[in-house]
Amino acid sequence: MLLGPEVQARQQLHHEDAIALAQLPAEAQSVHRLIRAGGPFTHSKDGAVFGNRERALPTRPRGFYREYTVATPGARDRGARRIVCGGREPKAPDACFYTADHYISFHRITP
C-alpha cells in the first residue's frame, strides 16, 4: 500500500525509535546539556520555534517545540543534525528528539 508523504512522516516516530542520551554523538550530548542550562548557544537560530510542519512529532500548539543545532563535523553550514525539544519551559522540556537528517526522521531522547 502506498502512503502519501504526510502519512509516512507521521508514522516515522515510533517508540522503538528512542535513543539513549549516551548513544547520541558527542556534539548532540553537548547541545542537550546546553539546553538544560539555558545556553549559551552557538547559532542565532538555536531556541527558535520549530513549527512541526512535517507532522513527524506529536501534535502540540505552535510554540511548544524549539530547535537547536547539533554541529556536523566538516559542514560549512548548520548541517542536518538538530535537537527539537518541547515543553513550556525551554530549560526543562517535556521531551526532546534528535534528527540526523534534517527533520525526515526523529528519535525520542531517553535518559
What would you call each of these model-derived segments?
Residues 1-7:
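C-terminal segment of classical bacterial N-terminal signal peptides
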Residues 7-58:
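N-terminal secretory signal peptides
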Residues 39-111:
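Functional cores of ribonucleases/endoribonucleases
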